[in-house]
Amino acid sequence: MKRILLFILTNVAVVAVLGIVASLLGVNRFLTANGLNLSALLGFALIMGFGGAIISLLISKPVAKWSAGVRLINDPQNADEAWIVETVRRLADKAQIGMPEVGIFEGEPNAFATGAFKNSSLVAVSTGLLQGMTKEEIEAVLGHEIAHVANGDMVTMTLIQGVMNTFVVFLSRVIGYAVDSFLRKGDSNSSGPGIGYYVSTIVLDIVLGFAAAIVVAWFSRHREFRADAGAAQLMGRKQPMMNALARLGGMQPGELPKAVEAMGITGSIGKLFATHPPIEERIAALQNAQG
């Protein structure tokens, strides 16, 4: 979940910043010089949309390291760390990808993989997961993350996010132009976009960006089933992954720190933004899979 949430939040921030920079550079004035030029706007939206998604992908690994406080295992300090590195190496060889960077971070049971390229990725696990699972279950979780990398999920999500960004940028400026035209009705002395346009587009870039995140999260939930199946294939059997999922389902997630408690998402709205399907559905999918 960390992998996709970080990508989505980074993407929203990048697109919003690019939108502000474009405004400061006078791009919006060009787009609205003689009414709203929809063809030019579409080209601008494509560049902004996919540009924002690609930038988010390229910085995903350093952002993940910083935000999660990942400590890379460059030189294993004990037998457990050596086992984690060797397990990741073995699974990566099976999946035919380059050896990822391996890291550990403090926190509740969790793990993630990220990175722009299959042969230059990062796999990280939390101390809570290492303390609460058997080695077989940990291996299954690592296999799940390796499967994400091997399946090219970050690139796939980037393409999906790029399409959604394009719609966000295009719609926000069309709506912003309509709002600005309404507010300045009868004002024949003004030229170029007004304050209504700039405020509307900045706000809509953020609001529609989160709406687009619902679609991205829906695709992410479907990719999780593939990663579960990939882990089972790498392990040679389904039971370890099923056991790991059952263990995760029975673990109590850590409480949110007070500083970010207001950003916690629960209930029906939370389900729309959920990047992972319910544990029960994932276990059932593995049970029903052939092999």
Swiss-Prot record:
How does this chain sit within the bilayer? Multi-pass membrane protein
Q: What is its EC number?
A: 3.4.24.-
List the GO terms this entry assigns under cellular component, sorted alphabetically: plasma membrane
Q: Which GO molecular function entries does the Swiss-Prot or TrEMBL record give?
A: metalloendopeptidase activity; zinc ion binding
For biological process, the GO terms are: proteolysis
| Source domain of life | Bacteria
Q: Where does Zn(2+) bind?
A: 144, 148, 224
Could you identify this protein by its name?
Answer: Protease HtpX homolog
Tell me which species this is from: Polaromonas naphthalenivorans (strain CJ2)
Taxonomy, top ranks, is:
Bacteria, Pseudomonadati, Pseudomonadota, Betaproteobacteria, Burkholderiales
Q: State which gene encodes it.
A: htpX
